[in-house]
A protein has these predicted regions:
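Hydrophobic faces of well-ordered beta-strands that scaffold small-molecule active sites
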Residues: 3-5, 45-47, 76-78, 106-110, ...
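Internal, glycine-rich beta/alpha segment that forms the wall or movable "lid"
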Residues: 5, 16, 84-194, 206-209, ...
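Glycine-rich, proline-tolerant flexible connector loops at the mouths of alpha/beta enzymes
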Residues: 44-63, 82, 202, 312-323
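Acidic (Asp/Glu)-rich catalytic clusters
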Residues: 64-73, 95, 99-105, 188-191, ...
Length: 353
């Protein structure tokens, strides 16, 4: 069972102090979290890609390279690379370079994105985004598999026997597909035999089970062995010493993160009752004491069969002292218990869906 942390690099004012980071200080803060996660022994650090002033990071590979230079073992991944708006050749080159810098620790989570800014910026029609994604994913898979690439598609110029250096240190860059709630995306990941990451940001854990079932059924039906059909999960995350302390502290930041920032804008206002419900035993929100966190991740493993959990740890203007304490508790109290429990009890329920 792998455990890690995620930053989407949102830039929001701390609701308690009004403090707002500039992009540079926010990026340096994120680098410090990656270093802290490595020092604490976590497995994965993930970083999002966005293209608006509300977020600090538009190029995850650059920031991950900064983290790579100061770390030794933690795996470094995008979450997600917005493949529909990127050139797969450049994406592969960037992460192959990161793989060389990090001595074999780079990964890509490719997805379609729930944010529209990148589509306008890179002149991609959102109406075509699934077809564009499939086309570019096909090229990215070819780039992973071959040193000399011959490929043709609809949304990028063809390649005819071209070398695309550099090659990564790993035989192939690990590639996961990021999926929100779309059954067709889960089916695609399974048919391709790629590991899948589910983004669970609301509702009940059990509501995600059909996506896990679609994914594994598609993969097994396509002839892929069960062991390659790995499933990861991301969710909003905050752990503190006590259950009530975690909820009382986190709610203002969670509300700030999700509320619409402009009239009619993206997001929603989370009431205290809604927060309590989604933070409950089967709710998607991962906040509470270390023991509650352990219990919920084990429940997710039982219901969904997850191999990897990544918590989004720095949202809504959370100050570094709270984020660092959350990382510390994840690494020192949650992770050892989960590793012991999952080593002693192999998955059954989720894998047999």
């Amino acid at each position: 069972m792998e455990l890690g942390i995620l930053s989407l690099s949102d830039r929001q004012a701390d609701p308690a102090t009004g403090r707002l980071h500039d992009a540079g200080s926010r990026i340096r803060e994120i680098v410090s979290y990656g270093i802290a996660a490595d020092q604490a022994g976590l497995d994965v650090f993930a970083l999002g890609e966005h293209h608006s002033a509300e977020f600090a990071v538009s190029s995850p590979a650059v920031v991950l390279a900064a983290i790579a230079q100061a770390t030794g073992s933690i795996r470094l991944t995008s979450a997600v690379s917005v493949l529909s708006t990127l050139d797969p050749v450049r994406l592969h080159q960037d992460f192959a370079t990161l793989d060389l810098v990090s001595q074999g620790r780079a990964e890509i989570i490719a997805g379609r994105s729930a944010f529209l800014e990148a589509f306008e910026l890179f002149s991609v029609d959102p109406a075509d985004y699934d077809e564009v994604f499939a086309d570019k994913l096909d090229l990215l898979l070819a780039l992973r598999a071959q040193e000399q690439v011959t490929w043709s598609g609809k949304y990028r110029p063809s390649l005819d026997g071209l070398a695309v250096p550099p090659r990564p240190q790993q035989d192939r860059l690990p590639l996961w597909l990021g999926v929100g709630g779309t059954p067709a995306s889960a089916q695609r990941a399974g048919l391709l035999g790629l590991p899948m990451v589910l983004g669970l940001i609301g509702g009940d854990i059990r509501q995600a089970r059909p996506l896990a079932e679609i994914y594994r059924h598609a993969g097994l039906s396509a002839g892929h062995p069960a062991e390659v059909l790995r499933l990861g999960l991301t969710s909003h995350f905050f752990v503190a010493d006590t259950s009530q302390g975690a909820r009382d502290t986190f709610y203002p930041y969670y509300r700030e993160y999700l509320r619409p920032k402009t009239p009619g804008g993206r997001g929603w206002v989370v009431s205290p009752g809604q927060f309590t419900a989604t933070a409950g035993p089967t709710g998607a929100l991962m906040t509470g004491s270390p023991q509650e966190t352990i219990d919920k991740i084990l429940l997710e493993r039982e219901i969904l069969g997850i191999d990897r959990f990544i918590g989004q740890i720095d949202l809504g203007g959370l100050p570094p002292r709270l984020v660092n304490r959350s990382i510390e508790l994840l690494a020192t109290e949650v992770a050892p218990a989960l590793r012991q429990a999952t080593a002693a009890a192999p998955m059954t329920t989720g894998r047999n869906t």
